[in-house]
Amino acid sequence: MVCEVIDRCLADRSLDGESLARATHLSRSTLYRLVAPFGGVGSFIIRRRLEAARYVLAAHDHRDTLSELAEQVGFASASHLSRAFLDHFGMRPGEFRTAARNQGGSH
């Protein structure tokens, strides 16, 4: 349920523990306990945003700019998304998109 709410609200950059607890009808302490193994609420939200960005980048019909994608998944800017993506996945979004398209084309 927490993941579903985050996924629906990805573009909302004000999404935080308080609003997530309200939307999921969980107490803040319960929510924080649930996501503690993932580094806390903020880290969990960022991970969901990064996974959404990775999914979109892997799609062969993806044509949005990095700035548009950043906005869609709740990052403040393309550079913020790019840095977070590199930190999390070990490659830049453009590198990932190229690799995903090359891999998809080899089947």
Identify the residue ranges that each predicted region occupies.
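DNA-binding recognition helix and immediately preceding turn/loop
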Residues: 1-42, 58, 62-73
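Short hydrophobic clusters on alpha-helical segments that form packing/core surfaces
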Residues: 2-6, 49-57, 85, 89, ...
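Short, basic, alpha-helical segments at the C-terminal edge of helix-turn-helix-like DNA-binding modules
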Residues: 19, 45-55, 94-107
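Short hydrophobic/aromatic patches on the structural cores and recognition surfaces of FHA
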Residues: 31, 53, 81
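Residue-level detector of secondary-structure transition/capping positions
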Residues: 39, 49, 61, 89, ...
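Sequence-specific DNA-binding recognition helix
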Residues: 61-99
